């Protein structure tokens, strides 16, 4: 948008704009491997580091006394998506200021199908998750509506069932499958502190391929 070519008569919409490029620090290995089960070949960043990067851009813009457009070309499949998290609130606050615009990525998943929304009208609802070959691992969250309580019952591709995994008010449950190397960690939160809603976090390590 800042290019200007006098020979061809071309000009972007903001020819006098400059760029502030911030390189984010990678998330700690403990969170990448143990909590979010992220394949090492993919990039991942901590929410706190993203907030620090935005703060740095704010600081530079304030020194230069110039308006800014903050663009975040990153996203996540986790969290409540209600706009109540720390990063959500921080960006919303910045966007309310004069001379500050915040642009983020949204949607464009195509056939990835990383999200599902349903309604438990009776006793249960069946949801299928397709796992590819040689998958390193993944984390998945089930968000509900307060004051309801939710439980999960997981069936592996080989047909093994965990039965209803009792969560109680909170706590972790560890599940192993006899015929597969999959290790499952299920964690219940009666009320998430940022969203005020119940959430079940499921972390799959070395998941078996299939549905």
Question: Where are each of the predicted segments found?
Answer:
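Sec-exported extracytoplasmic/periplasmic mature domains
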Residues: 2-3, 55-62, 92, 96
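Short acidic, glycine-rich surface-loop motifs adjacent to enzyme active sites
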Residues: 22-24, 52-82, 105-106
């Amino acid at each position: 948008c800042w290019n200007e070519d006098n020979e061809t008569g071309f000009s972007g919409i903001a020819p006098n704009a400059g760029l502030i490029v911030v390189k984010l620090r990678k998330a700690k290995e403990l969170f990448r491997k143990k909590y979010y089960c992220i394949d090492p070949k993919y990039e991942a960043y901590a929410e706190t580091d993203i907030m620090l990067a935005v703060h740095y851009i704010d600081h530079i813009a304030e020194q230069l006394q110039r308006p800014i457009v903050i663009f975040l070309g990153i996203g996540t499949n986790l969290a409540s998506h209600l706009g109540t998290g720390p990063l959500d609130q921080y960006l919303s606050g910045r966007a309310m200021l004069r001379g500050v615009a915040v642009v983020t990525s949204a949607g464009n998943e195509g056939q990835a199908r990383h999200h599902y929304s349903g309604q438990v009208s009776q006793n249960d609802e069946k949801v299928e998750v397709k796992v590819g070959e040689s998958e390193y691992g993944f984390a998945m969250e089930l968000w509900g509506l307060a004051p309801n309580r939710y439980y999960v019952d997981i069936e592996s591709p080989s047909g093994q069932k965990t039965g209803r995994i009792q969560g109680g008010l909170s706590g972790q449950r560890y599940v192993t499958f006899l015929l597969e190397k999959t290790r499952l960690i299920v964690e219940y939160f009666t009320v998430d502190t940022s969203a005020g809603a119940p959430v079940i976090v499921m972390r799959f390590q070395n998941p078996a391929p299939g549905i």
